[in-house]
Structure formats: structure tokens, C-alpha cells
Design a protein with these regions (language model features):
Chain B
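Domain-level signal for soluble alpha/beta catalytic cores
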Residues: 1-299
Length: 294, 299
């Protein structure tokens, strides 16, 4: 049986499923240069981290494609003409190439570990910074951009698509529509605020996705969201404090002060969430995933 | 006092050498540049200043490009969100780092034991992304933010402000007003496009006329390839009688880092600089102490 239908059967039987942990914050913690999502200089470490999560017992692997879209490059130039004038020669081709590479290394890690039953989730995320719902594009603008990303992930061979850290309902709807055009199953996950709502302030909607989750917020906020939206079936909070660097403007996944959430405490909290899908967002390590699994 | 001697050089028609790139030089030394590295690798930052001092720079600039309160705040939904999920010191880190930037430059200057005076320029730039004038805050907001930055620089001991990579007249005027309010000397550097106009579409003639009453000592062009900087100089020259400066970038922007190319080795860069016929010369991204050394020896 294909990996996703097998996972779906497990979920239908009421089993708990463990997702992996974060790529970005864990790679940065190990000194990886956060350029092209780490692929510019440290592709081997990306592969190795996927393997660590598999060894820790993750039932799902997520691609290292968070906040990877054309805007990440375009936003730091005046316009496309300026990008071609002073930018590195291949910036136009960067996103398609890295998305393909990200899926390839996730699949390679799965194959090498002999864990062929593990589905690979193609990660999609907000087109602007995940913590800035005020910058989110309109549905009409977002749809074609998400459609390209979904198509690239699908063509590279992911088993399903996971919309992470969505910060407005309208962009989530656009990304969901785009993802569904591939014919693959889709999960949608929202970033929430301390009020347990979507970071935009909207209530968490019930969307026509195969699963709905919350992520990208501290455990207490995640718990608040779960209490308000019983249709959520998964959660993967971040732990510690977001510590952005002094210069870089796009997303930079550095989290500090994570000591207050050692693996055992995290696993105990996760048990109380009472959802089928659990994993970890920024600050989480393979140790935490191992604790969740056991 | 050190600035007075730089100003005297300018008034006497002499060439003033500005330093070269710091951010890309940090990268070239195999250290990551997502952070300014002012606290994590002060040794590297100090060593780069030392290299530019040894190369013959009359003015060294602090490693504080785009380092503002806003740079931290804009990673979050709002201030409450920053306090809720952000690292504990994010509200004050900008000022701590600006002070650290001046301190490292001052330490390098003291350690160099030079006989000629060298001025430290507190480097500040656009409040939003340097190539995006469309994102610039309102003039009143900008002036208030520039003023708090200028205050920290003046208090930490910067000799002048280098307002660099400016892409609209509105931002330049806001920064100039802030500097004047503090009473610190200031220079303003604009990013030119291929035709020598600002990214906002405004002309350098308009920039010069708007700034003249605020009395910057030098207007410069930076953060663009040599050809564009040259185009900017030609646009500015008829409208600006005081000193003009230039410090283009070389290589290619490879977000968030830099792609070094061999298009402009020091000898070719020197030839370009001769053709600019300006009084202040230095280097932006991609330039190295070797570039500055040749400028200092030959110009």
C-alpha cells in the first residue's frame, strides 16, 4: 500500500501518529548557514537531520521547504529588473530547484532508512512572513503562487501536502485550493496567538482538508486553540523564544531559551492535548520526537 | 576632534578614504552574516576595522547596517507578540548592538596606534529594506526613529553619521533633520539606478536641493554597481558644490548573502575610482581591504 493511504488507515483506526520535528531551527542550532533553507552550503546536514527524525521514530517526514517561495528573493530587490541587474544570475530558478532538491533529500533519507511506509509531506507556508498576517496577500494574488509551489512539490514526488503556520483564513483557503489542484491529500495547520485564535485574530475555521492542525506557537497557546476548535486533530507547538538576527529580514529560524521544555516535559504535555497527530515546531529536537514516540 | 581633521581635508580639496565592506567581509572570512556578529564574534569585526585602518582609511564605519528597533519588531505581529514569543531583550537589543558597533570601531582605532586622525562614522540606513522605498515609513515616524538611532551613536562616541543606501528624498531629509537635531555631522549616500536616479524615481538634483539647507558635509553614491554609481555622480555634480563621494558594490547580491566575482579586482576598481573625480572614495559590498589599500596609496 502507498504510504499515505496506509497512514490514513492508521488514523481511521484511532492510532496516534508522530510527526517529525523542525528542520530550520535544528539546522541553525548546529551552525548551518540559513541561505536557500540551508541547501546552499549544507545539503548533507539536511539529509542527516531527516534521518535523525526517522531514527527517533517519526511516522511522517516534512520537507525542508518552509517559507521557501519566490517572494523570499524578490522582496529584497526593488523589482524583477533590479534583481536581474544586481542579483546572482540564477535567482529566478532558485525556488523550483530547491523545492525539487528538498523533496529528493527527504525521499533519499526515507529510502536509506528502509522506512518506505513513511509518507513525505510537502510543506507549504505563508508567502510573506508567518508572524505577519498584516502582510498576507489577497486570495487572488496568493492562488497562482501557491499553485506553482504545490505543483513543484507534487511533481517532485511528495505523498501529501501540509500547509503550515497559515496566519490568515483567506491565504489558507487559497493555498488549500492550490494544493487540492494536485489531487494529493492536504492537511492545514494554523499559527495561533495567545487567544487561541488564528494569529490574524480570526476564529480557527473548519476547512475541507484531510486533517486540521495548529503549530508555530507556544504549548499554552496551542492548548488554548485545541480547546476552542474540537475539529483539530493535530498539534506541533514551538518551544523557547524566537530570536531573530539583527539584520536578516526574512524568516530566520533561530530559537533560544528552549531548556524549560526538556523532552519528557514536552511528551507529557503532548499527551494532554489529546489529539492524534503530534510533532514539533521550532525549538524541538530529535530527542523530543523520540520521547513523543515512546 | 577627529572629524575636524577630516573636514579640513575636505575643505582643502584633498581625497578622503572611506573604508570598504564589512558585512560581506565577515562572510568572506567564513562567518555567517545573518547577524552582525557584534557580540558573537567581536574579534572578527574588530579585525576587519583594523585591516581597513591599516589599508589607510580616514573614516571607518560601524558594522550597523540596517540595525534598528524595527529590524527586530518586524519579525513579529506586534509588540505584545514579540514580548510573548520573542527572546527577552529584543526591545533594547538594537541600542545595545549600536553601542557595541561603535565600541569595536573605537577599540580597533585605539589599537592601531595611527599618527593621523581617523573618524568613526555611525552607519545608519533606510528603516525598511534598503532597495524598497515603497515600504518607507512616514516622514514623522522616520525622523523619530532616526533620531533615537542618532542619539545612541552620538552618545557612544561616533564622530559623524553616515546615512547610507538611501533610496528616496523623503528618507534622506528625515535622517538629516534627526542628525541636525542631535548636532552631529552627517554625510548622506544614495543608491542610484542605471540612469543615475533614485529608486523612488526622484532625481539627485531634487535630492541635492532638498538637502542643501540641512547642510550635510558630503553627498555620496553607494550600494550599486560601479556603472550606476558613475551615472549617479554625473547626475549629482551639477547640483552639488560641496564634496561628493562614491563607494559602489562589486559582485552580486545572493540573498541573504553575497556572490563574490572577479570582475573588479583592486587595480580595475582603482581605475574606476579615478574616473569618478570625487573627493570621498571607499567600497560597498564585495570590496576588501586590498581595494581600499590601493585607493589610499594611489589617489
Amino acid at each position: 500500500m502507498q504510504p499515505y493511504p496506509a497512514l490514513r488507515e492508521r488514523l481511521d483506526r484511532g492510532e496516534r501518529v508522530v510527526l517529525d520535528g523542525p528542520m530550520g531551527s535544528e539546522l541553525v542550532r548546529h551552525g548551518v548557514r540559513w541561505a536557500d533553507n540551508g541547501f546552499r552550503t549544507n545539503a548533507d546536514q539536511v539529509t542527516a537531520l531527516h534521518q535523525e527524525y526517522l531514527d527517533a521514530g517519526a511516522d511522517v517526514l516534512r520537507t525542508n521547504t518552509f517559507q521557501l517561495n519566490r517572494r523570499v528573493y524578490q522582496n529584497v530587490f526593488r523589482d524583477t529588473a533590479h534583481m536581474r541587474h544586481i542579483g546572482a544570475p540564477d535567482l529566478d530558478a532558485r525556488v523550483p530547484r530547491i523545492i525539487g532538491r528538498a523533496v529528493e533529500v527527504a525521499r533519499a533519507a526515507r529510502d536509506r532508512a528502509g522506512r518506505l511506509e513513511v509518507p513525505i509531506a510537502g510543506v507549504m507556508s505563508p508567502l510573506e512572513h508567518c508572524f505577519r498576517p498584516d502582510l498576507a496577500p489577497s486570495f487572488e494574488e496568493a492562488l497562482p503562487e501557491h499553485t506553482e509551489i504545490a505543483r513543484l512539490l507534487a511533481q517532485a514526488g511528495v505523498d501529501f501536502l501540509l500547509l503550515e503556520s497559515m496566519n490568515t483564513v483567506r491565504e489558507a483557503q487559497a493555498a488549500l485550493r492550490a494544493a487540492q489542484l494536485t489531487g494529493l491529500p492536504v492537511w492545514v495547520s494554523f499559527v495561533v496567538g495567545s487567544d487561541g485564535r488564528v494569529l490574524s485574530g480570526e476564529p480557527i475555521p473548519q476547512l475541507a482538508a484531510d486533517a486540521m492542525l495548529v503549530n508555530c506557537a507556544p504549548p499554552e497557546d496551542i492548548q488554548g486553540a485545541l480547546a476552542q476548535a474540537p475539529w483539530l486533530s493535530g498539534a506541533y507547538p514551538h518551544i523557547g523564544r524566537f530570536d531573530p538576527p539583527s539584520w536578516k529580514f526574512e524568516f530566520f529560524p533561530q530559537f533560544t531559551c528552549t531548556e524549560s521544555w526538556p523532552a519528557e516535559r514536552y511528551a507529557a504535555a503532548a499527551r494532554a492535548w489529546n489529539v492524534q497527530l503530534v510533532g514539533g515546531c521550532c525549538g524541538i529536537t530529535p530527542e523530543h520526537i523520540k520521547a513523543l514516540k515512546s | 576632534m577627529t572629524y575636524q581633521s577630516v573636514k579640513a581635508k575636505l575643505q582643502n580639496g584633498k581625497t578622503v578614504i572611506l573604508d570598504g565592506a564589512i558585512g560581506t567581509e565577515i562572510l568572506r572570512r567564513e562567518v555567517t552574516w545573518a547577524d552582525h556578529q557584534l557580540r558573537k564574534r567581536p574579534d572578527v569585526v574588530r579585525a576587519i576595522h583594523a585591516d581597513y585602518l591599516a589599508a589607510g582609511a580616514d573614516v571607518i564605519s560601524t558594522n550597523t547596517f540596517q540595525l534598528t528597533r524595527r529590524a527586530f519588531r518586524q519579525h513579529f505581529k506586534d509588540d505584545a507578540h514579540m514580548r510573548h514569543i520573542g527572546a527577552p531583550d529584543l526591545e533594547t537589543r538594537w541600542a545595545d548592538l549600536l553601542r557595541a558597533g561603535v565600541t569595536l570601531a573605537a577599540e580597533a582605532r585605539a589599537a592601531a596606534g595611527l599618527e593621523h586622525p581617523v573618524a568613526i562614522a555611525g552607519a545608519m540606513t533606510t528603516l525598511e529594506w534598503c532597495f524598497r522605498p515603497d515600504l518607507a515609513p512616514s516622514p514623522a515616524e522616520a525622523e523619530a526613529e532616526y533620531r533615537e538611532i542618532a542619539e545612541v551613536f552620538a552618545d557612544a562616541g561616533a564622530d559623524l553619521l553616515l546615512v547610507e543606501t538611501v533610496s528616496s528624498v523623503q528618507e534622506a531629509v528625515a535622517a538629516a533633520r534627526a542628525a541636525r537635531a542631535i548636532g552631529i555631522p552627517f554625510w548622506i549616500a544614495f543608491v542610484p539606478n542605471e540612469r543615475g536616479a533614485l529608486f523612488s524615481g526622484e532625481s539627485l538634483a531634487m535630492a541635492a536641493q532638498s538637502l542643501a539647507p540641512l547642510e550635510p558635509d558630503v553627498l555620496l553614491l553607494n550600494c550599486a554597481p560601479p556603472d550606476d554609481v558613475r551615472a549617479g555622480i554625473e547626475q549629482l555634480r551639477p547640483y552639488w558644490q560641496k564634496p561628493i563621494g562614491a563607494y559602489p558594490h562589486i559582485g552580486r547580491f545572493n540573498p541573504p548573502e553575497w556572490l563574490f566575482t572577479d570582475e573588479y579586482p583592486p587595480t580595475r576598481y582603482l581605475e574606476e575610482a579615478r574616473a569618478w573625480r570625487v573627493q570621498v572614495v571607499g567600497g560597498c559590498c564585495g570590496t576588501t581591504p586590498e581595494h581600499i589599500e590601493l585607493l589610499a596609496q594611489r589617489l
